[in-house]
Amino acid sequence: MLEIFDVSFSLMSNNKLDEVFTLRKDTFKDRLDWAVNCINGMEFDEYDNEHTTYLLGVKEGKVICSVRFIEIKYPNMITGTFYSYFDNLKIPEGNYIESSRFFVDRDRVRNLIGTRNPACVTLFLAMINYARKYHYDGILTIVSHPMLTLLKRSGWRISIIQQGLSEKQERIYLLHLPTDDDSRHALIERITQMTQAESEQLKTLPLLVPLA
């Protein structure tokens, strides 16, 4: 069973934080070669703080995926780290949350679930369920072109707000990730096609999905 749940930075155990930060280093530094700061084999930054909430996907006690949420009213990567990568960045007004540090650990997923699995789409769905549960207007995030393609293929009805250039002169995008019924239904349909999960049980958080 894959369980995805939300937990605040303040309530995370040191062991679980270390596990997440180590997996983030594996993804963002070792695999993607992003310009991130790493200490003692872990990747973390100033946005991992008391204003942060994480979604954690856990299988057999091990984290296999995660994403970080920060309410847009607090310091975040859109208004901080990435702001200079856009010309006159225009952030929509409203009760939004920013998402960042999205990852699915390939090795752990392969070992614990197998190669054909809906782990990524399930984490997308959990993001929608979280935003709906806490009554946010939607999710704002900045992504690379490969991540943009992945989101589009999932069926999520995303929209591009603005395009910028990263420090590597690669295209990046400020996106609005909506929490509408159509988007949620599209993701649920993808998951039910690959698992024995029932549609109604996928509309909650914590999110439980029967996986091998």
Swiss-Prot record:
It catalyses: a fatty acyl-[ACP] + S-adenosyl-L-methionine = an N-acyl-L-homoserine lactone + S-methyl-5'-thioadenosine + holo-[ACP] + H(+). The lineage of its organism: Bacteria, Pseudomonadati, Pseudomonadota, Gammaproteobacteria, Enterobacterales. InterPro entries: Acyl_CoA_acyltransferase, Autoind_synth_CS, Autoind_synthase. Its EC number is 2.3.1.184. One of its GO terms (biological process) is quorum sensing. The gene is echI. It holds the Pfam family Autoind_synth. Required for the synthesis of OHHL (N-(3-oxohexanoyl)-L-homoserine lactone), an autoinducer molecule which binds to the EchR transcriptional regulator. Keywords: Autoinducer synthesis, Quorum sensing, S-adenosyl-L-methionine, Transferase. This is Acyl-homoserine-lactone synthase. Belongs to the autoinducer synthase family. It comes from the Bacteria. GO terms for molecular function: N-acyl homoserine lactone synthase activity.
